[in-house]
Amino acid sequence: MRNAIFATPLVSDFFRQYWRFLWRVGACRGVYANYREASKACAAFKKHGYNDALFYGPAIIGEPVHMRKRDYPVLYWLSQSLKEGTRILNLGGNAGTEYFTYRQFIHFPDGVRWIVWELPAAVNFGQHLAQVSKSPDLSFTTRLEDGDGADIVLVAGALQYIEEDLPTCLKRLSALPPRLVIHRTPLYEGETFFTMQSTYGSVVPYRIQNRQELADSLLKLGYRMVDCWCEQRSVIIPFYPARSSDRFYGFYFVLDDSPDPTWKTDAIETAMEVRKQIRHPWSN
């Protein structure tokens, strides 16, 4: 009987909303029109925001790295794009998580520069890691403009936490980067909104964006979608079932001065078809 009661939608949502929210990493609460509203709601909690060393300290060098199948598209496109002197701008790259992980699986040619744009707490810890690991090709900054001249922009699991949307971030650079790799981003078919997410004892704003809106915003900048991938992974917003997302997406875009018009219509579906024709090393 007790299990049946907790299985009912209303009781289940109430349990997630008020009982488990602060104690369950990744739990979400509320729907807000923009980042400012969500941030204001987060401020009602004793601990809020991302600028805390607690979020970055666990990224310790030397621990075993276990790749997941979802990460292989990123490895593939990076391996196809890296060449001598390539500059990578890693948006929200924590304390170098992607750098330390990916370099164990793909070759970094001479002169590759990996720049992480992050909050001060991540930058401080990341600089320490770069020093102790003797990684002169890894640097950190709180200034997005320090990424000027980037050949690749990589954002993996961080786009949903950044106040500005991706086109706005890209326009702050002196020139649009030729390649974009987007990974682990929650998207759905409804209207873009923000919610609050519980993360290691803190509460932070969290964006869930309309899938086609994200793609179209980059196509309008002149990018061409080459690949798209997704995984089934849920973000549940209690009391707002229509706002919940059940998939995280990844994309590979290239800047195209003369885009083929066929890429402008149903871009995501087109990329999915192209993906079937690409022989990835993990698809055997």
Q: Where do the model's predicted regions map?
A:
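Membrane-proximal basic amphipathic "stem/tether" segments
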Residues: 1-43, 270-284
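Short alpha-helix
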Residues: 204-229
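A short SAM/SAH-binding and catalytic strip from SAM-dependent methyltransferases
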Residues: 151-165
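Class I SAM-dependent methyltransferase Rossmann-like catalytic core
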Residues: 32-84
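Conserved beta-strand signature within the Rossmann-like core of class I S-adenosyl-L-methionine
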Residues: 177-196
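Class I SAM-dependent methyltransferase SAM/SAH-binding core
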Residues: 93-139
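A short, conserved alpha-helix within the catalytic core of class I
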Residues: 161-176
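Conserved class I S-adenosyl-L-methionine
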Residues: 85-95
